[in-house]
Design a protein with these regions (language model features):
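C-terminal structural segments of small proteins and small subunits
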Residues: 64-66, 71-91
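Short S/T/G/P-rich N-terminal loop/turn motif that feeds into the first structured element of a domain
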Residues: 1-52, 57-68, 92-98
Length: 98
């Protein structure tokens, strides 16, 4: 079943975040499809950050494999230092029953 990595946060250090993007994009490329990269998300409930990212993976296992890989774990600290008010999750897609 298709799965999605959904992240929402505020970028507090653009230069550091660009460094993270440059290093993380090749890691996430294998089987992933970037669906959303919005720098001006409009929050309607709660206190969401301004940036939202949605990445599609073929399965939840594939998404977890990328997130938990040594390569991604080596750069995740850069993202965490560049953002605040962050949250992220990996969720299964939904198939409407027929």
């Amino acid at each position: 079943m298709t799965a999605y990595l959904i992240a929402n946060y505020d970028v507090v250090d653009r230069d550091l975040y660009r460094s993270y993007q440059k290093q993380s994009m090749p890691i996430m490329a294998g089987g992933a499809k970037l669906l959303v990269l919005d720098h001006a998300s409009v929050g309607k409930e709660g206190t969401p950050g301004a940036q939202t990212v949605v990445i599609e993976y073929p399965t939840k296992e594939a998404a977890l494999a990328v997130y938990e890989s040594d390569e991604y774990q080596a750069v995740i600290g850069i993202r965490l230092s560049a953002i605040s008010n962050g949250r992220g999750m990996i969720v299964d897609g939904f198939v409407m029953p027929s």
